[in-house]
């Protein structure tokens, strides 16, 4: 099994990505196992931030690194919280605080104007100076609920309505979420690209 470092300190992402990546024969090691320091996400886009994180993890560990930068884009809020999704309510905000701030911002907004999507960018760097990192996108369309539902998932999952299953993301079984999610779609794209490269 190939080892790969996951460049995130978010335990929810570590669990989800380890599960997804194991399907493709990768052993996922969290960067915390190597005492990799958090790096400042100074980019202005998901791609820039993912590259910053992947390069830093590869540099510190000497292993290939995969980084995901993702967030929730709410149309009524002109794409916010976007790259600031994890710190929407402040630098050290909890998932609950971010969720409550978003619900407050969307209070009174009619259902038709509550459209949103999760957007994930995944970057795989084979080494710190990889000149051609693999970059993949995944999007998951839905809308913002008026209150939280469900116990599964993390982040904004309890208020993200999934039209395909008529429930909140946090009410989905993990296997179903894997099929639908932005992260699952980005990973499928990543492995399609990896397979194409190894076949050449």
Swiss-Prot record:
One Gene Ontology MF term: metal ion binding
Catalytic reactions of this protein: XTP + H2O = XMP + diphosphate + H(+); dITP + H2O = dIMP + diphosphate + H(+); ITP + H2O = IMP + diphosphate + H(+)
EC number(s) given by UniProt: 3.6.1.66
InterPro entries xrefs: dITP/XTP_pyrophosphatase, ITPase-like_fam, RdgB/HAM1
Binding site for substrate: 8-13, 70, 154-157, 177, 182-183
The record's free-text note on cofactor binding: Binds 1 Mg(2+) ion per subunit.
Highest taxon in the source lineage: Bacteria
GO BP annotations listed: nucleotide metabolic process; purine nucleoside triphosphate catabolic process
Listed GO CC annotations: cytosol
Binding residues annotated for Mg(2+), in chain numbering: 69
Keywords linked to the UniProt accession: Hydrolase, Magnesium, Metal-binding, Nucleotide metabolism, Nucleotide-binding
Uppermost EC category: hydrolase
Active site per the UniProt annotation: 69
Cofactor: Mg(2+)
CDD domains on file: HAM1 (cd00515)
Gene3D superfamilies per UniProt: 3.90.950.10
Pfam families: Ham1p_like (PF01725)
Function: Pyrophosphatase that catalyzes the hydrolysis of nucleoside triphosphates to their monophosphate derivatives, with a high preference for the non-canonical purine nucleotides XTP (xanthosine triphosphate), dITP (deoxyinosine triphosphate) and ITP. Seems to function as a house-cleaning enzyme that removes non-canonical purine nucleotides from the nucleotide pool, thus preventing their incorporation into DNA/RNA and avoiding chromosomal lesions.
NCBIfam families cross-referenced by the UniProt entry: PRK14822.1 (NF011397), RdgB/HAM1 family non-canonical purine NTP pyrophosphatase (TIGR00042)
PANTHER family: INOSINE TRIPHOSPHATE PYROPHOSPHATASE, INOSINE TRIPHOSPHATE PYROPHOSPHATASE/HAM1 PROTEIN
HAMAP family, per database record: Non_canon_purine_NTPase
Family as reported in the entry's similarity comment: Belongs to the HAM1 NTPase family.
Assembly description: Homodimer.
Name of the protein this chain belongs to: dITP/XTP pyrophosphatase
Species of provenance: Vibrio parahaemolyticus serotype O3:K6 (strain RIMD 2210633)
């Amino acid at each position: 099994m190939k080892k790969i470092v996951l460049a995130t300190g978010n335990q929810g992402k570590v669990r989800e990505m380890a599960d997804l990546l194991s399907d493709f024969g990768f052993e996922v090691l969290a960067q915390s196992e190597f005492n990799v320091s958090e790096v400042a996400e100074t980019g202005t886009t998901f791609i820039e931030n993912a590259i910053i994180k992947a390069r830093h993890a590869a540099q510190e560990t000497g292993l290939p690194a995969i980084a995901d930068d993702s967030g929730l884009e709410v149309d009524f809020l002109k794409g916010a919280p976007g790259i600031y999704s994890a710190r929407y309510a402040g630098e050290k905000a909890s998932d609950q605080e971010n969720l409550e701030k978003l619900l407050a911002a969307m209070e009174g907004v009619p259902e038709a104007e509550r459209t949103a999507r999760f957007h994930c960018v995944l970057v795989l760097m084979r080494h710190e100076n990889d000149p051609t990192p693999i970059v993949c996108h995944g999007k998951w369309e839905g809308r913002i609920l008026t209150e939280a539902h469900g116990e599964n998932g993390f982040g904004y999952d309890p208020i993200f309505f999934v039209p395909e299953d008529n429930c909140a993301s946090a009410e989905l079984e993990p296997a179903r979420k894997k099929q639908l999610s932005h992260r699952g779609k980005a990973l499928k794209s990543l492995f399609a690209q990896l397979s194409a490269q190894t076949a050449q």
